[in-house]
Swiss-Prot record:
S-S pairs: none
GO molecular function: structural constituent of ribosome
Keywords, sorted A to Z: Acetylation, Cytoplasm, Ribonucleoprotein, Ribosomal protein
This protein's encoding gene: RPS1A
InterPro entries (UniProt xref): Ribosomal_eS1 (IPR001593), Ribosomal_eS1_CS (IPR018281), Ribosomal_eS1_euk (IPR027500)
Subcellular location, record wording: Cytoplasm
Transmembrane domains' residue ranges: none
Name of the protein in question: Small ribosomal subunit protein eS1A
Subunit structure: Component of the small ribosomal subunit. Mature ribosomes consist of a small (40S) and a large (60S) subunit. The 40S subunit contains about 33 different proteins and 1 molecule of RNA (18S). The 60S subunit contains about 49 different proteins and 3 molecules of RNA (25S, 5.8S and 5S).
Amino acid sequence: MAVGKNKRLSKGKKGLKKKVIDPFTKKEWFDIKAPSTFENRAVGKTLINRSTGLKNAADGLKGRVVEVCLADLQGSEDHSSRKVKLRVDEVQGKNLLTNFHGIDFTTDKLRSLVRKWQSLVEANVTVKTSDDYVLRIFAIAFTKRQANQIRKTTYAQSSKLREVRKKMIEIMQREVSNCTLAQLTSKLIPEVIGREIEKSTQTILPLQNIHIRKVKLLKQPKFDLGSLLALHGEGSTEEKGKKVSAGFKDVVLETV
């Protein structure tokens, strides 16, 4: 009789389940901070795999773009139809410092503006801000009925629409090129540019529902940590030494 190990008896049961490992144990959470131009700076949280070996978690977070409802950032439901994109530029401990990356309308709001019996005017322009951000601005407007108008429709002539579109582009170029990105964000929230377009085009055509529909970031300047910290109200991280008086002399010890 052969003496040895019985392979059939030593085999374990088939179909044993593997040990389930929770994937969240390998991840860590970070707080997203919005720029100080918004009312609420606490945007939310995001997660990423923990730093292991040469792989740093901060490298995977930089450049990440998050989309937030403007109503949450401003604490008002009046802005619920707008979405803001924020880009992570710096990681400080567990905080992610973000910068403005774009703004857009929600689909349902945009669809609700388009109606029958009126003309649609759209314009877009590529502008550089005073701090060298290249943006593409999209504006939208609709014709409205004049006072004491009997006719049902408010269609406009093509020549009038071209004049309005030209005026819209001029105003967008003027308003954007003379301000920084942070100042532009402050203008976009209360619809300052839309009201300026409405005032300037009254002599050409009466308009309604004038909005900056979308702002898209095309190019950004070289990253500057000091300006980002100033945008978040945290000051500069540069260490400055104290000025030494002219009569200062090193103390020489006679004995050690």
